[in-house]
Design a protein with these regions (language model features):
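Bacterial N-terminal signal peptides that target proteins for export
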Residues: 2-13
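Juxtamembrane helix-loop transition sites at the ends of transmembrane segments
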Residues: 1, 20-21, 128, 226
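Segments that shape or occlude catalytic/ligand-binding pockets
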Residues: 111
Length: 232
């Protein structure tokens, strides 16, 4: 009886190990080629470092300002380790202030070949002022030193920020939000939410972009060019 029980336990253990191996293989297969390349280059997966941060890559869908899918295989958000440490700090501070909220990342490290696809889509249009030209070295996303981000509930529902993320217009600017409220282009609550987002991101060490409430850089372009490398 004991021998049969021992054999049964052994078989169950083998089946468990086999199922775990299959799951590991499937997980590796699901990870995109771009994700593996970013990891090899030393960039870190945001969700692996801090699972409490929500991720929804907007360029993995067509509902972005370009109107097309730019990330064919990338589903995960990556950052330079220094930027990731700053983001983790910002998330922790947000949790201190508002335990019911979380940061939600819409874009992070962006390979330069994706930047080229984006530029080709908008060049010679009114939108090209919002996109860094790869011929000029690209932008901070191309160093893994920038995030497009918002606030959300613990379920992932985004808060009112006045405009959709990726909205190209003056209502997305952060330097005249009081006027935007007076003109009823954004609500007082949206202004409050933007201010909270900037507060926690600045605490983490990020620099807001004047024309996009959702965009934050970890360092200046000059610093990035001097000390960091572009993601090909």
């Amino acid at each position: 009886m004991k021998m049969r029980r021992h054999r049964l336990v052994s078989r169950l253990a083998c089946l468990l190990l086999l199922s775990c191996s299959v799951i590991s293989v499937e997980a590796a297969q699901k990870e995109s080629q771009t994700a593996r390349k970013l990891a090899r280059e030393g960039y870190v997966n945001i969700r692996e470092v801090d699972p409490s941060i929500h991720v929804s890559l907007m360029y993995g869908r067509a509902d972005n300002f370009c109107g097309v899918v730019l990330y064919d295989d990338l589903k995960e958000a990556f950052l330079h380790p220094e930027a990731m440490a700053a983001l983790k700090k910002a998330q922790a501070y947000l949790k201190q202030l508002r335990p019911d909220l979380s940061l939600k990342v819409y874009d992070a490290a962006r390979p330069m070949h994706i930047q080229q696809k984006m530029w080709d889509k908008v060049k010679h249009t009114e939108k090209d002022i919002y996109v860094s030209n790869p011929a000029h070295g690209g932008g901070m996303h191309n160093y893994g030193m920038a995030v497009d981000i918002t606030l959300c509930t613990l379920k992932g529902d985004t808060l009112d920020m006045g405009t959709k993320i990726d909205y190209m217009g003056s209502a997305a600017h952060i330097d005249h939000e009081d006027r935007l409220v007076e003109e009823k282009k954004i609500s007082k609550k949206a202004r409050e939410n933007r201010q909270l987002l900037r507060k926690v991101m600045r605490y983490g060490g990020f620099i807001p972009l004047r024309t996009e409430w959702w965009h934050f850089n970890k360092c200046s372009r000059a610093t990035a060019k001097k000390y960091y490398k572009v993601i090909p």
